[in-house]
Amino acid sequence: MAIAVDYFNLHPEAFRYLYYTPQHGAWFGASPEILLDCDKATDTFVTMALAGTRPVIDDGKPWSGKNLAEQGVVRDYIVDTLYDLGLQPHVGKTETLTTGNIQHLLTRITGHCEGVESTAILSALNPTPALCGWPRAAALEDIIEYERHPRRCYGGYVCVENARSLAAYVNLRCVNFDNAGRWCMYVGGGIMADSDAADEWDETCHKAALLQGLIGGKTESI
């Protein structure tokens, strides 16, 4: 619990969560990525295209073409999916989001969703290309064939719903742990056709660095 609280304190801007289910065990994370936020009273929604990653020390520098293209794929997918549902999304300006020791490219997408169930929007959006690639069906087949480990809850979403609203956040950079002191950390990178393998590895290490620093050598990996 102490490690989770320390991690939460490093991400005050994120959706911070800790949960347990008998089927999936205990998890915690701090997600900056809104998959869907619906206000049921006004029938309005917010989602975002969050992709492209660099260390915070690069703040102020131009974003690389690879990162811009990666984020553009996610943005276009979300917008096209919303149009396919009969919605009229408004696409905001792309900006830089700082979360912990890294930065992402962020485009907020908003609109009205009267007549469309929030669960239908969730099902259509998830998973975005940031989690599974594109085209989605072919990418999911490749993940099933080539990945040697189960993703379990990683890449899904954590959803909080009541009579007034629904908010779902992507389960990114998260940890599965047990009471024996064992931890399994999940992070990922966005690979494009022109990606450099060493750069992608460095990006993944940057994403994992804060969690690794907190967990350190105190525990055993699952």
Go through each PLM region and give its residues.
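Contiguous alpha-helical scaffold segments within structured protein domains
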Residues: 46-144, 216
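A glycine-rich phosphate-binding loop feature that marks nucleotide/adenosyl-phosphate handling sites
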Residues: 21-26, 79, 94-102, 157-162, ...
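Conserved hydrophobic core element of enzyme catalytic domains
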Residues: 110-222
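An anion-binding catalytic pocket shared by soluble metabolic enzymes
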Residues: 1-68, 73, 162-188
